[in-house]
Amino acid sequence: MTLKIGVPSKGRLMEKTFDWFGARGVTMRQTGAEREYSGAVDGVDGVELVLLSAGEIPRELGAGRIHLGVTGSDLVREKLADWSLQVAEMAPLGFGHADLIIAVPAFWIDVDTLDDLDAAAAAFRAAHGFRLRIATKYHRLVREFLMANGVADYQLVDSQGATEGTVKNGTAEAIADITSSGETLRANHLKILSDALVHSSQAVLFASRRADWSEAAGPFAALGARLGLPLPEALT
């Protein structure tokens, strides 16, 4: 049996992942045409490269169809309930940094904290008859965060792209989204609440707790020796 490792199929995440493994003596490369999403691993026997979208990798790890996967820590926490029971964090990779934050219109001069947001949400509902809308694609993470911080009288509305524009377009009053520099937020006249860092994300190498490791432990031992990573006892 081979050890299957899922890697983002395109863009900077794929390039940075290839670089990270390559610096440790494990060469990953695409094979065939660019859109075939097939690849190979050189330097370690018995390792199969599976190219997937970053959003698919948590699901494949949770289902046990791949043994290892590189994806954002935000995506694993969002897509897998009780994520730590389904996967183990093997190594932070030091790239793909971004923060999941909550932002409101910059002209809300009296709203700077989560307590302020809670008060504004209550006032909004009293004035308009419906809950304040927060646009996001991170429903699980944002809901858990707001609940833990006592924010009520809001509703999450789904946004799978251009979330920063939802306030300007009138489909939401606030947003919860990933940002690296904050430039896009400022361009859309939004400000980050001072205490609303939901999650600080980066690319992480994860191991599946649901995969069959009985015959993959050998290839992982060879791979782990290159990477300086032991196989967690819970996975054997």
Swiss-Prot record:
Gene label: hisG
GO terms of molecular function: ATP binding; ATP phosphoribosyltransferase activity
Keywords: Amino-acid biosynthesis, ATP-binding, Cytoplasm, Glycosyltransferase, Histidine biosynthesis, Nucleotide-binding, Transferase
EC number(s) on file: 2.4.2.17
Any one of the GO CC terms: cytoplasm
Pathway: Amino-acid biosynthesis; L-histidine biosynthesis; L-histidine from 5-phospho-alpha-D-ribose 1-diphosphate: step 1/9
Record field: catalytic activity: 1-(5-phospho-beta-D-ribosyl)-ATP + diphosphate = 5-phospho-alpha-D-ribose 1-diphosphate + ATP
Domain notes: Lacks the C-terminal regulatory region which is replaced by HisZ.
Entry annotated with the keyword Glycosyltransferase: yes
Organism, scientific name: Cereibacter sphaeroides (strain ATCC 17023 / DSM 158 / JCM 6121 / CCUG 31486 / LMG 2827 / NBRC 12203 / NCIMB 8253 / ATH 2.4.1.)
CDD domains for the chain: PBP2_HisGL3 (cd13593)
Protein name in the entry: ATP phosphoribosyltransferase
Principal localisation: cytoplasm
